[in-house]
Every structure is written in structure tokens, then in C-alpha cells.
Amino acid sequence: MIQPQTHLNVADNSGARELMCIRIIGASNRRYAHIGDVIVAVIKEAVPNMPLQRSEVIRAVIVRTCKELKRDNGMIIRYDDNAAVVIDQEGNPKGTRVFGAIARELRQLNFTKIVSLAPEVL
């Protein structure tokens, strides 16, 4: 469960290392975001000499959360960290690689480019 002021790791090579959630996109008063939700975030830590800089406001899609995700078949998935992938306005990833495992639910939410870049889909 991601809410405003939550810090997230970045799971791609876009140049950002750490994000802080500012807003959850989709509803005016939603409190929490889960896997597959799009958020507005600010870059708190960035790699030097990359296109994305610190204090830049960007959009990102959540790919991993510490809070468990329950599937319809009863399986529960939980990750060790909260992570997101930086996306542009059309929903395409800004990076060319995705690090770590991501959930299968992203494929149903039309983030197929992120799923194809991921090394492991759970």
C-alpha cells in the first residue's frame, strides 16, 4: 500500500534511484495505491549525468509492494521492497531495462512493454 510521502525504489535504468509519491492517479481522494497503479512522484535521488534529475516531477507505475497481493486462486505474493518504473504520458517506460521481478497483473493492465523488459514475471 503506497500513500503520499512513501519512498520507493526505482526498478529501471531511467536515471532515478529513489522516488517519493506525491499523488495517486485515478480518483480524487484515493488513499492507497497498489501494484499496477500510476502515481505522480518526485525524484529524491538520481544518478549523475542522466536525463532525469533530482526534484523532477514524473509519473511512475508501481511494480512491487511490501503489502501482500492476494490473487483469485488464493496465492499471496509479497515483495521485499516498494518499487516503481518511471513512465511517460503514454504509459511507455523511460528506461530500457527493468530490474527485479514484477507481478503478472501488469500485463492485464496494458503495461506490456514493462512486462517484456522484466527478467522475471511472478
From Swiss-Prot:
InterPro entries: Ribosomal_uL14, Ribosomal_uL14_bac-type, Ribosomal_uL14_CS, Ribosomal_uL14_sf
This protein's UniProt keywords: Chloroplast, Plastid, Ribonucleoprotein, Ribosomal protein, RNA-binding, rRNA-binding
Molecular function, one GO term: structural constituent of ribosome
GO annotation (BP), single: translation
Domain of life according to the entry: Eukaryota
Broad class of where this protein is predominantly found: plastid
Compartment list: Plastid, Chloroplast
A cellular-component GO term for this protein: chloroplast
Reported function: Binds to 23S rRNA.
Subunit structure: Part of the 50S ribosomal subunit.
Family stated for the protein in its record: Belongs to the universal ribosomal protein uL14 family.
Protein name: Large ribosomal subunit protein uL14c
Source organism per UniProt: Drimys granadensis
